[in-house]
């Protein structure tokens, strides 16, 4: 099933909202002084859905300006979108593999979904269109699928995740130990980069090279290497 993201296309009342309100002709872009450091974090709430009782939406804005959106459709499936986020005044823009979505930052704790043109949505049905900051760490319901350029040199492994545009150190869960043997079999020279399809989660771990803590991508399921393929 095609991911239903851009989120505004999920909300049938938003896509078809015809309420005559003068504010609809103005964008929601107003300077507020928000910055990357005080916006990054986890936001969560249940949003309405056109063809299901609702969807539990969890948005993880990582400090490196990448994001993970988890949409758990009630009674159905869980899907993920990954990408980059940017901030212009009080407008949060998500550019993911499934399209672009925008939110208005109302305050430190609340962001509100905007329409496809970046305007406030005026909903006569009083459905909730906001996500609330959640101070608990992001824990995905399922392993997150990623694709990117993987390389290894001894015990040091890294991946450039295409959708996020960032490099992350890699660790292998016990269920993914076969990945290293598959990599050694597929490469033609030491540390050769290969396009990889993986599933896993992000986790803060001690660095292998120094005393700092780094954001690792922990592989839970190795799917495949695709020699010759590059990030689009």
Each model region followed by its residue ranges:
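Positively charged n-region of N-terminal signal peptides that target proteins for export
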Residues: 1-4
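C-terminal motif of bacterial Sec signal peptides marking the signal peptidase cleavage site
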Residues: 12-14
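Lipid interaction determinants
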Residues: 17-80, 95-154, 162-163, 167, ...
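Beta-strand/loop nucleic-acid-binding surfaces
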Residues: 166-186
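Short nucleic-acid-contacting surface segments enriched for D/E, G, S/T with interspersed K/R
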Residues: 180-199
